[in-house]
Amino acid sequence: MNWMEVSIVINHEVQEFVTSILEENESNGVVIEDSKDLDGELADKFGEIYELDPNDYPDTGVRVKAYFNEIDYSEELKNQLLRNIQELAELDKNIFDYNEQIIKESDWENEWKNYFHPFKASKNFTIVPSWETYQKESDSELCIELDPGMAFGTGDHPTTSMCLNAIEQYVKPSDSVIDVGTGSGILSIACHLLGVRHIKAVDLDELAVRVAKENFEKNSCENAIETTTGNLLKGETNKYDVVIANILAHIIEEMIEDAYNTLNEEGRFITSGIIIEKSDEIIEHMKRVGFNIISINHDNGWACIVGEKVSN
């Protein structure tokens, strides 16, 4: 199977809107190449891990790369993307650019290696590519070895980072956890590293499930995590202390009631993948169902919301 890489150069003001448009049109992952990164702005957050190649970045603005299954990428989809992006009021059409290229699946692993290096994703979690060696900086540092494959979820997106921080704060070793839309399995691995022993990872995409299983093996937790294909929480009969979902807002809307019903009393629903503009709608829906909102965090235009199931 081949993949269509869509490369779009835009101004910073519309970055989050364009990313959301691509994800809502079911892209299989997004890469951000920000011209500001060449100024060293990431150094304070992630440390001096590697040097950036200026040739990989636009002269100005942001290059957003999205990946679609070649079979699914049609002229109709292209026109819809162009129409939605060009309708953005703040779009600077002087720098706007839209390009496409086919990437063979056999080349995908090497393509990702150009972007993926060790970095600190949260207070205690560091993400380490499976093809690189890394020396822990302290005993408290928890390293997740990862090969994103085609499932993405490398931890460098603000939503994943916020979920990792929420997991550190709200997940206990004694908890049972279900990770909905597990992708590369990063959030399930994080729970395992914190001592959780009852974890279920679910994804609708069979490829994502395969990649997640491979990453569980890399982190020696394949026997501790139940992995399965499934459509959100539909058909789930077990109860859990924590439901985690880092997926798009309109999908989260569909599963809020199921998340509430799947949780034990005082269980926690950790959810992200929500642009700030849609966060109030999600929060109100969660409250109507019966959740007590215990945490709301924002990062770069995205929100992470944690709700607790109120005892009846």
Swiss-Prot record:
<dbReference type="GO" id="GO:0032259">
    <property type="term" value="P:methylation"/>
</dbReference>
<dbReference type="InterPro" id="IPR029063">
    <property type="entry name" value="SAM-dependent_MTases_sf"/>
</dbReference>
<dbReference type="Pfam" id="PF06325">
    <property type="entry name" value="PrmA"/>
</dbReference>
<keyword id="KW-0808">Transferase</keyword>
<dbReference type="InterPro" id="IPR004498">
    <property type="entry name" value="Ribosomal_PrmA_MeTrfase"/>
</dbReference>
<dbReference type="GO" id="GO:0016279">
    <property type="term" value="F:protein-lysine N-methyltransferase activity"/>
</dbReference>
<protein>
    <recommendedName>
        <fullName>Ribosomal protein L11 methyltransferase</fullName>
        <ecNumber>2.1.1.-</ecNumber>
    </recommendedName>
</protein>
<dbReference type="InterPro" id="IPR050078">
    <property type="entry name" value="Ribosomal_L11_MeTrfase_PrmA"/>
</dbReference>
<feature type="binding site">
    <location>
        <position position="246"/>
    </location>
    <ligand>
        <name>S-adenosyl-L-methionine</name>
    </ligand>
</feature>
<feature type="binding site">
    <location>
        <position position="203"/>
    </location>
    <ligand>
        <name>S-adenosyl-L-methionine</name>
    </ligand>
</feature>
<keyword id="KW-0949">S-adenosyl-L-methionine</keyword>
<feature type="binding site">
    <location>
        <position position="160"/>
    </location>
    <ligand>
        <name>S-adenosyl-L-methionine</name>
    </ligand>
</feature>
<comment type="function">
    <text>Methylates ribosomal protein L11.</text>
</comment>
<comment type="similarity">
    <text>Belongs to the methyltransferase superfamily. PrmA family.</text>
</comment>
<keyword id="KW-0489">Methyltransferase</keyword>
<dbReference type="GO" id="GO:0005737">
    <property type="term" value="C:cytoplasm"/>
</dbReference>
<keyword id="KW-0963">Cytoplasm</keyword>
<feature type="binding site">
    <location>
        <position position="181"/>
    </location>
    <ligand>
        <name>S-adenosyl-L-methionine</name>
    </ligand>
</feature>
